[in-house]
Amino acid sequence: MTDSILKCTTRHIRIFTARCENNDLVQDSEHLTLDLDPDNEFIWEELVIGKVHKRFSELVDSYSGKDLSDYNLRKIGSDLEGTIRQLLQAGELKYNPDCRVLNYSMGLPRTKDLL
């Protein structure tokens, strides 16, 4: 294992091989930290956050016993991006109209008018 923090950064997901202590990341190869939607592009309800965390746990468990590599972290991050997209398309997640930049990165909102 490496002495530096491995990370995966996607548009809405950041995963680090670190733990958070006093708002700082401390390298820990036995721990993964998930930073969900750091730009606050979406409005998150606890139930939806729970679904993303559950999927994250499932993905991490599926890599149990395998090398923790940049590639595997990117695969987990990409899968979580897909989960976010599914939640958005199902109407369980909504864009945050107060977001700094509202760019509809996961596609236009689905409304009855647009369907």
Curated annotation (Swiss-Prot):
InterPro entries: NdhM. Its EC number is 7.1.1.-. It comes from Prochlorococcus marinus (strain MIT 9211). The keyword Transport applies. This is NAD(P)H-quinone oxidoreductase subunit M. It is found in: Cellular thylakoid membrane. GO terms for cellular component: plasma membrane-derived thylakoid membrane. It holds the Pfam family NdhM. It catalyses: a plastoquinone + NADH + (n+1) H(+)(in) = a plastoquinol + NAD(+) + n H(+)(out); a plastoquinone + NADPH + (n+1) H(+)(in) = a plastoquinol + NADP(+) + n H(+)(out). NDH-1 can be composed of about 15 different subunits; different subcomplexes with different compositions have been identified which probably have different functions. NDH-1 shuttles electrons from an unknown electron donor, via FMN and iron-sulfur (Fe-S) centers, to quinones in the respiratory and/or the photosynthetic chain. The immediate electron acceptor for the enzyme in this species is believed to be plastoquinone. Couples the redox reaction to proton translocation, and thus conserves the redox energy in a proton gradient. Cyanobacterial NDH-1 also plays a role in inorganic carbon-concentration. HAMAP family: NDH1_NDH1M. The gene is ndhM.
